Amino acid sequence: MCLEPISLVVFGSLVFFFGLVKYFKRGERQRTRGILQPEYKDKYYYSKEKGEEMGEVANVNEIPVKIRNHKYPAKEHNLRVKDLLLNRNPKLSKISTAFFIAGEELEGNKYCDTNKDFRQNRYFYHLSGVDIPASAILFNCSTDKLTLFLPNIDEEDVIWSGMPLSLDEAMRVFDIDEALYISDLGKKFKELQDFAIFTTDLDNVHDENIARSLIPSDPNFFYAMDETRAIKDWYEIESIRKACQISDKSHLAVMSALPIELNELQIQAEFEYHATRQGGRSLGYDPICCSGPACGTLHYVKNSEDIKGKHSILIDAGAEWRQYTSDITRCFPTSGKFTAEHREVYETVLDMQNQAMERIKPGAKWDDLHALTHKVLIKHFLSMGIFKKEFSEDEIFKRRASCAFYPHGLGHMLGLDVHDVGGNPNYDDPDPMFRYLRIRRPLKENMVITNEPGCYFNQFLIKEFLEKHPERLEVVDMSVLKRYMYVGGVRIEDDILVTKDGYENLTGITSDPDEIEKIVQKGLKKPRSGFHVIV
């Protein structure tokens, strides 16, 4: 068919136009169809070139729908602290009150021109939502006015780091009433000469006149801040949920990648890599990545042993998202199949967690749930033969023999810190069963906690908790115990939101042992080309 030149131009223009329409529609779908959105959480596409299932590429800037276009609610947090502080100390209602917090500053490494990793003061962040070093906030309880003080512009720093956030930009980004520079602090404090001004500490307060006008370390002020942080608002809950979603996929990646995980450090690397690719710029704590007998160390820090010849892996790792952290632990067999002893221990811990989970609701006493998990452990150990059958469950419980295998608490508060504030622990408790329990209060709605029972076979724990206490050692069949030592330990940890009538498990990665075996086995069948192709 022969077309005139003018017709070719028109035809080409139409093709180009419809091509653009298709392109932008496709782009819109990509923008609204991120892998991290709940409705696409389990969606995958098939790569014909590689002949394998692959996840969609994550959008590192994806923001949860519920908090999209919302500022971090700093004003609301300040108002809650104010109400709790005045209720705690009614005398303050008769005088003018304010609180001031100086944020963390960049700290240099000795003898070089690099800085330590910056981590914002959590109290400061909770009352500001600001992650800028050397900033400060002032909240006037009389006017409910929140003022942010940004560091003065350093021309030399601009040469290397670019222009910092301007005052106008700060007003648009943060939930504040006023933005000033640090150089304006003195003038602002002159307006508050008759105020009682509370602060956390004087560590980053460099003006002596301002320091003299502050009241540091007041227990009522800390109570008000801790209680406010303990009960999460909607924005905080969605932030933790997002952190959990990032960690879910990172744990799945670790379970699926044993062919390229020859050392514990490579387990850590796999988790951090996938967390970073999803926008988790840091972890909430140093990850625990251990194998074999090392799994019996509660907070293992080496992450350096080869995995060859080990039967078990334990990874305790949680990504942060916008300062809020997750905290998830999973265990899996290196062969893709639990050994008989590993499976028994795993199902014991899973039963401990499930029994506690069923009872999580407002008003539940954490002490009672913790004690319950010890009783579940004792029941299983009697069945396994580790505890001698001539002793009753109650007798073993009273002797605290289970503490040799489960020395830590059932869980802790979770939020801006991995071991968040507000749990009211009592580390001086003479009872070994409760000494390390980090929550010693009834649960309340909108608390976020971890549910993380464990079972460990650790020579040091056996020596400290059994051999030094004959009444405990008496109930243990050491010949049976020896068969389980190679397992090291098992801990299963989920992040739980206490709801009005019960709980919501924010953790999505499976803890079902059959499903875990399938995930590991599928990963073991992948060829080398199915993973990172360079190293």
Swiss-Prot record:
Superkingdom of origin: Eukaryota
GO molecular function: manganese ion binding; metalloaminopeptidase activity; peptidase activity
Cofactor binding annotation: Binds 2 manganese ions per subunit.
Cross-link Glycyl lysine isopeptide (Lys-Gly) (interchain with G-Cter in ubiquitin), where in sequence: K50
Stretches that traverse the bilayer: 8-24
Membrane-protein topology: Single-pass membrane protein
Keywords: Hydrolase, Isopeptide bond, Manganese, Membrane, Metal-binding, Transmembrane, Transmembrane helix, Ubl conjugation
EC number(s) per entry: 3.4.-.-
UniProt binding sites for Mn(2+) 2: D316, D327, E493
A Pfam family reported for this protein in Swiss-Prot or TrEMBL: AMP_N
Sequence positions that bind Mn(2+) 1: D327, H412, E452, E493
GO biological process terms, semicolon-separated: proteolysis
GO cellular component: cytoplasm; membrane
Cofactors required: Mn(2+)
Family named by the database record: Belongs to the peptidase M24B family.
Name this protein carries in UniProt: Uncharacterized peptidase YFR006W
